[in-house]
Amino acid sequence: MARIVVAMSGGVDSSVAAALLKEQGHEVIGIMLRLWSEPGVIEDDGIERVVQNKCCSLEAVDDARRVARLLDIPFYLVNVEQEFKDNVVDFFYQEYVAGRTPNPCLVCNRHIRFTLLLNRALALDADYLATGHYVRVDDHPITGKRRLRRAVDREKDQSYVLHVLNQQQLAHACFPLGQYTKSEVRAMAAEWGMTVATKAESQEICFVAQNDYRGFINRYGAALAEGNSSSGPTAEAGGVITLPKPGPIYNQDGKVLGRHRGLAYYTIGQRKGLDLTSPEPLHVLKIDAQQNALVVGPALALEQASFTVGKMHYVSGEIPTEPFEAAVRVRYKAIEQPALVTPLEGKRAQVTLLHPQRAITPGQGAVFYGGDNGDEVLCGGLIE
């Protein structure tokens, strides 16, 4: 049997993952990461209140500890607030200010869960780090390399946010829930008497209070302007963090139609909040960070037949030199689309779609699937 560290969150998924491993006879250690959360904010009445978010609330910590007691496993709470802020929160803010739409889960999985926490697990002589993600991992029958595959429950599949993992990380990764459906997981939790069996799951960004990213950007930017390093971003070496600034809104012909509040408050395809008068609905077609400008136009103009991807990561570790066919997912919940992928220099790729798609958004992950059943994650990167 193996020694396995389980990343616990106080939710039903990580709780059942720990229980399954314990039932299989493994030595299980529960670790919960204390992540960064916003400090109190001053409301209109002058009273400072904590803006609630999902990062390690007292309730979540209590739930995780209660499950650990039920399973009779050690439980530790590890503070990684600064690392999370530096690697995930600052990145999230900077990307929005630069006119891109980030997915912070990609960065968190790469730098926090499967680097920082995995290293902690290995320091405890653990063989594996397990999480409650819905995804499968196995060995390729011919090459022996680790494969990342979609979960049995396609509705809950989380392979998209784990495409960033490399072979070394996958060698120590364990995903007990990959073969189960969400309803089966809840049923097991209830059978084991877990109070989290009916706990609602969050679809929100964990560190953004009330799922209001625009409000978060306002508060975070204000903290930066005031020089509050504990609640605002810290510039990394060689990097410059700026604040959202108003700028022009152009149509496709270059005519100025109005002013925007700051690039951080908009995303590709957005229609609401433009404050423009037009006989037809207008959508954000382009976010031009160099000119600090938005370009808007009709919905039909959102369609693209090709795009480029940067920071390409190949799960096998082998970088192809020839074009290859794959199914690409351009957003977390998007439907995969057939595409031709042409590798380029500098960890980039050109993607040509068989069917044009709308609102392909810079900053989002593009994840490519293939293999015998089309459920293997081949590679992924960030849309440029």
Segments (PLM) and residue ranges:
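ATP-dependent adenylation/nucleotidyltransferase module used to activate substrates
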Residues: M1-H163, C174, E184-V185, A190, ...
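AMP-forming adenylation/ATP pyrophosphatase catalytic core
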Residues: A130-V137, I142-E384
